[in-house]
């Protein structure tokens, strides 16, 4: 059935994994339904991404989304897929998408207790050149008895119940955490199922790669400039860090998780509040990185401690191996002390 052996009789699929986690937590099954619906959407998006050129899904849809990005045709399709799958899971009450200006409130007859924040297709500016892209999501419980509203999504990342991302690269991968470490699943095309490939992934304490868009060096603050200089021209005589930057956050974050090192999208003169969105970009990946033993910071506080004020709020993001992030924070503190 798969290429790994003639026939596997006891494989741990992601569907089975999600059901087992729900059983262990003695839950109602609502989160299980929700995660399985999210996975169905991810499989459908994966299929659409693979067929995009043939189905004329490349190119621009002719609109700009609420955060100022050009909307690609695949973005529109992916957004509709995720919204429809999540609402038909009967487990959500509020959805926040990068593509929608307002929060989406699930109809009463389909309503559940979970809030989902997601970016249906992160890195979609890379679609036309076939670079890796992804889907990112974070799931929260509704904490009030009030009628659902966008306020239900304004929770710090510490409240996340489950989070993950899908990476549509040379294969389709899902990284998922329900608060007990990070597990990686690969889509087996022969089965149409995600199969566990790595359990309880841990990030290296220190890496050898730094990842940021150096094209913005003109706008960097003193701390970022100093840190990058240290990585390129180490004062202790050690080898310089390698530079890697795809420009698709899911791809850059996943490489950082697997190989170690640091990913930076700091505030700069052009984007003083940062560029990446807190609810559906920064929080989910910060949660995954922390669950894997890494650190994720805005430069002034852990990303997961930020109390959101609006659903499309932007924050700086620096994440990766703990020693590397601490070294960056030391540069920040040194430059603040020197002011």
UniProtKB/Swiss-Prot annotation:
CDD domains named in the record: FBPase (cd00354)
UniProt-annotated binding residues for substrate: 122, 213-216, 245-249, 265, 275
A single Gene Ontology CC term: anchoring junction
Binding site for Mg(2+) 3: 119, 122, 281
Recorded metabolic or biological pathway in which this protein acts: Carbohydrate biosynthesis; gluconeogenesis
InterPro entries for the chain: FBPase_C_dom, FBPase_class-1, FBPase_N, FBPtase, Fructose_bisphosphatase_AS
Known partners and oligomeric status: Homotetramer. Interacts with ALDOA; the interaction blocks inhibition by physiological concentrations of AMP and reduces inhibition by Ca(2+). Interacts with alpha-actinin and F-actin.
UniProt-recorded name of the protein: Fructose-1,6-bisphosphatase isozyme 2
Native species: Oryctolagus cuniculus (Rabbit)
Lineage: Eukaryota, Metazoa, Chordata, Craniata, Vertebrata
Encoding gene per record: FBP2
């Amino acid at each position: 059935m798969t290429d790994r052996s003639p026939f596997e009789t006891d494989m741990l699929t992601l569907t089975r994994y999600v059901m087992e986690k729900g059983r262990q937590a003695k839950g109602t099954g609502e989160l299980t339904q929700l995660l399985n619906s999210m996975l169905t959407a991810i499989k459908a998006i994966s299929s659409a991404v693979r067929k995009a050129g043939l189905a004329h899904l490349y190119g621009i849809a002719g609109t700009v989304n609420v955060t100022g990005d050009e909307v690609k045709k695949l973005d529109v399709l992916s957004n509709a897929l995720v919204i429809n799958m999540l609402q038909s899971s009967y487990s959500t009450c509020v959805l926040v998408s990068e593509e929608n200006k307002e929060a989406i409130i699930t109809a009463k007859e389909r309503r559940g207790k979970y809030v989902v924040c997601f970016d249906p297709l992160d890195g979609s500016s890379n679609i036309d050149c076939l670079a890796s892209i992804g889907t990112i999501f974070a799931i929260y419980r509704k904490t009030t008895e009030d009628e659902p509203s966008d306020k239900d999504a304004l929770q710090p990342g510490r409240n996340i119940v489950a989070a993950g991302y899908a990476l549509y690269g040379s294969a389709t991968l899902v990284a998922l955490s329900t608060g007990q470490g990070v597990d990686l699943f690969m889509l087996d095309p022969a089965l149409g199922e995600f199969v566990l490939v790595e359990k309880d992934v841990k990030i290296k304490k220190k890496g050898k790669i730094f990842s940021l868009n150096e094209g913005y060096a003109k706008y960097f603050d003193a701390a970022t400039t100093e840190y990058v200089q240290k990585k390129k021209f180490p004062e202790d005589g050690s080898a310089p860090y390698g530079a890697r930057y795809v420009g698709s956050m899911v791809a850059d974050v996943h490489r950082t998780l697997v190989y170690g090192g640091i990913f930076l999208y700091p505030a700069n003169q052009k984007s003083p509040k940062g560029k990446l969105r807190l609810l559906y970009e920064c929080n989910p990946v910060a949660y995954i990185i922390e669950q894997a033993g890494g650190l994720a910071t805005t430069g002034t506080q852990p990303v997961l401690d930020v109390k959101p004020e609006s659903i499309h709020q932007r924050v700086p993001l620096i994440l990766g191996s703990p020693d590397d992030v601490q070294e960056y924070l030391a540069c920040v503190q040194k430059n603040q002390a020197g002011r």
